């Protein structure tokens, strides 16, 4: 029996794609010297479904059910960007109420995503209890989603120019109840996790990224904010109505896994703050922009004015994308989720480039795990927060 | 000799600290013993679906005008609309209509855009079969109403605590409508 003899009897270990802590189907080829990681090569593509190509043969309405399959834990964000890009391309305004509903849905989705990050991250570190606790709160969020949209994960709720349906009766109260309940849940997590010395030993100083490095690697979201850079697209881009709420960008300057944990926990609290404010002052009015189907010549009256005539009930299924291109982005829980959209005066987008946050954040992994121990791969990979559905698309 | 003693001392302190926090964690875990389980025994107990739940699609043959909007908004052009143009009435006559629920993803686009509301979402979600071709529903299968969960006496329904008594009456009324 002859094994390829390398420099110092290095061992090459294949982790994944079926490894439970690879968060899906990521495959890592890890070169080990004893317990130390010498090299790590991620291999992607096990969940590639050609989402960008599919978009080129679908109208936006037809494509909307697909998008929740990119990042299937932060489903509302994929829908938000899918409608935001054509909206910006065609300069479609959305009513205030629709914008508020979107904000509430997005922030609920952010909480759900961060919760399902927290559970597996702790499970990777060997703490199984939070994994069960998070599902309790997450289930409540999904109940809210089901009541409003009809499905727990594959909502198909956002439409060009608004949302598909208004909030059902009593939903607002249910949402407020959830906010109160969830704040107690966060306190429970923090008591359980944040000060725990075993947890701290595992995460403190592990996977350090300096601020400069984070920018150079193109990281975004909590990965970037944990390295001391206060960059949140909700503050920077002012999309939807995020500027009407009082909230702060969560950030830490340490740049290690613990900082990323703290940023995400803080973001969940901030999301609750945003939801509470949005629910408090949600305006009445239409939940859908009824202008989308208006004829061009009748566009004189001011939007939502008394004179304003609403023509269609639904945005047309034959929504045409004009021959322009643009890049639209939202702050998804994992980072900057963007679409580079090229229209071609037809129903189908000519190009639909997705910029998934997980994919860009994942590229720093080999550098982070080098010279660390084998067991730290789980911590670092967990703290990056990837979903293979959006990494491979 | 001296560094060894301090080493032992700090190790001891660390151990005590760890033990204390493990104790604190256990108190939180133990505080959960006092609550009811969140899960339900699925086949014997079922939670009532929300009103907007998107289950199997119901289709009314007589309402359909064969406009094929459902096909145009479907992500995979799934509904199969078989029609013939009748010259004497100058209308499209619908002959057959079928949806394959083995392929449908229940996105609800067809229901949303149907101009005559001949499509609707039911609360039926148990669609498992041994043969996938059984899931290809024609207009007759599509027009069947689902058995209401409330009407099934072998199943205990679990009500969400937030639902009020008004809801309760309403759902009992709907049972009498749904369940022939």
Swiss-Prot record, chain A:
It catalyses: a plastoquinone + NADH + (n+1) H(+)(in) = a plastoquinol + NAD(+) + n H(+)(out); a plastoquinone + NADPH + (n+1) H(+)(in) = a plastoquinol + NADP(+) + n H(+)(out). GO terms for cellular component: chloroplast thylakoid membrane; plastid. The keyword Chloroplast applies. GO terms for molecular function: NAD binding; oxidoreductase activity, acting on NAD(P)H, quinone or similar compound as acceptor; quinone binding. Pfam families: Complex1_49kDa (PF00346). One of its GO terms (biological process) is photosynthesis, light reaction. InterPro entries: NADH_Q_OxRdtase_suD (IPR001135), NADH_UbQ_OxRdtase_49kDa_CS (IPR014029), NDH1_su_D/H (IPR022885), NiFe-Hase_large (IPR029014). Keywords: Chloroplast, Membrane, NAD, NADP, Plastid, Plastoquinone, Quinone, Thylakoid, Translocase, Transport. Its EC number is 7.1.1.-. It is a peripheral membrane protein. It is found in: Plastid, Chloroplast thylakoid membrane. Its main location: plastid. The keyword Cell membrane does not apply. There is a 56 residue fragment from the N-terminus in a second position on the plastid genome (corresponds to 9311163); it is not clear if this is transcribed. PANTHER family: NADH DEHYDROGENASE [UBIQUINONE] IRON-SULFUR PROTEIN 2, MITOCHONDRIAL, NADH-UBIQUINONE OXIDOREDUCTASE 49 KDA SUBUNIT. NDH is composed of at least 16 different subunits, 5 of which are encoded in the nucleus. Belongs to the complex I 49 kDa subunit family. This is NAD(P)H-quinone oxidoreductase subunit H, chloroplastic. It comes from Oryza sativa subsp. indica (Rice).
Curated annotation (Swiss-Prot), chain B:
InterPro entries: 4Fe4S_Fe-S-bd, 4Fe4S_Fe_S_CS, NADH_quinone_OxRdtase_chainI, NDHI. GO terms for cellular component: chloroplast thylakoid membrane; plastid. It catalyses: a plastoquinone + NADH + (n+1) H(+)(in) = a plastoquinol + NAD(+) + n H(+)(out); a plastoquinone + NADPH + (n+1) H(+)(in) = a plastoquinol + NADP(+) + n H(+)(out). Keywords: 4Fe-4S, Chloroplast, Iron, Iron-sulfur, Membrane, Metal-binding, NAD, NADP, Plastid, Plastoquinone, Quinone, Repeat, Thylakoid, Translocase. Residues 55-84, 95-124 form the 4Fe-4S ferredoxin-type domain. [4Fe-4S] cluster 2 binds at residues 74, 104, 107, 110. Its cofactor is [4Fe-4S] cluster. [4Fe-4S] cluster 1 binds at residues 64, 67, 70, 114. This is NAD(P)H-quinone oxidoreductase subunit I, chloroplastic. It comes from Oryza sativa subsp. indica (Rice). The lineage of its organism: Eukaryota, Viridiplantae, Streptophyta, Embryophyta, Tracheophyta. The gene is ndhI.
């Amino acid at each position: 029996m002859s094994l390829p003899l390398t420099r110092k009897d290095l061992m090459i270990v294949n982790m994944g794609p079926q490894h439970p802590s690879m968060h899906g189907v990521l495959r890592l080829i890890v070169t080990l010297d004893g317990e130390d990681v010498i090299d790590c090569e991620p291999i992607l593509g096990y969940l590639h479904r050609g989402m960008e190509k599919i978009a080129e043969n679908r109208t936006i309405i037809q494509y909307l059910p697909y998008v929740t399959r990119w990042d299937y834990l932060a489903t509302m964000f994929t829908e938000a960007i899918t409608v935001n890009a054509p909206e910006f391309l065609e300069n479609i305004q959305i009513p205030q109420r629709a914008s508020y509903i979107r904000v509430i849905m997005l922030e609920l989705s952010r909480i759900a995503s961060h919760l399902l990050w927290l559970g597996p991250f702790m499970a990777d570190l060997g703490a199984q209890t939070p994994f069960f606790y998070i599902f309790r709160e997450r289930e409540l969020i999904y109940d809210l989603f089901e009541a409003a949209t009809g499905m727990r994960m594959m909502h198909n709720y956002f439409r060009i120019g608004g949302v598909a349906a208004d909030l059902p009766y009593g939903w607002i109260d249910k949402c407020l109840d959830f906010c109160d309940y969830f704040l107690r849940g966060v306190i429970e997590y923090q008591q359980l996790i944040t000060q725990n010395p075993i947890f701290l030993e595992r995460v403190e100083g592990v996977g350090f990224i300096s601020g400069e490095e984070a920018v150079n690697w193109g990281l975004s979201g909590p990965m970037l904010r944990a390295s001391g850079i206060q960059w949140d697209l909700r503050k920077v881009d002012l999309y939807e109505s995020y500027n009407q709420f009082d909230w702060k960008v969560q950030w830490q300057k340490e740049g290690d896994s613990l900082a990323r944990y703290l940023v995400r926990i803080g973001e969940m609290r901030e999301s609750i703050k945003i939801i509470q404010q949005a629910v408090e002052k949600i305006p009445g009015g239409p939940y859908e922009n009824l202008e989308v189907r208006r004829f061009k010549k009748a566009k004189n009256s001011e939007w939502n004015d008394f004179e304003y005539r609403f023509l269609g009930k639904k945005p047309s299924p034959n929504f045409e994308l004009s021959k322009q291109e643009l890049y639209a982005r939202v702050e998804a829980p994992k980072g900057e989720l963007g679409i580079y959209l090229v229209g071609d005066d037809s129903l189908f987008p000519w190009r639909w480039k997705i910029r998934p946050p997980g994919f860009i954040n994942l590229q720093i992994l080999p550098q982070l795990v080098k010279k660390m121990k084998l067991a730290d791969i789980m911590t670092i990979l967990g703290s990056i927060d990837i979903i293979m559905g959006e990494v491979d698309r | 000799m001296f560094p060894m003693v301090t080493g032992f001392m700090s190790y001891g302190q660390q151990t005590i600290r760890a033990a204390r926090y493990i104790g604190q964690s256990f108190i939180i875990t133990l505080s959960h013993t006092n609550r009811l389980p969140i899960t339900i025994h699925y086949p014997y107990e079922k939670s009532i679906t929300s009103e907007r739940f998107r289950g199997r699609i119901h289709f009314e043959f007589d309402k359909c005008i064969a406009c094929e909007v459902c096909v145009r908004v479907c992500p995979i052009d799934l509904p199969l609309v078989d029609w013939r143009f009748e010259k004497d009435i100058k209308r499209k006559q619908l002959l057959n209509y079928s949806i394959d629920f083995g392929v449908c993803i229940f996105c609800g686009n067809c229901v949303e855009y149907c101009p005559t509301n001949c499509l609707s979402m039911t609360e039926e979600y148990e669609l498992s079969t041994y043969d996938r071709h059984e899931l290809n529903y024609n207009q007759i299968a599509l027009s069947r109403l689902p058995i209401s969960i409330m009407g099934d006496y072998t199943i205990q329904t679990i009500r969400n605590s937030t639902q009020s008594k008004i809801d309760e009456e309403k759902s009992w009324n709907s049972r009498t409508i749904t369940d022939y």
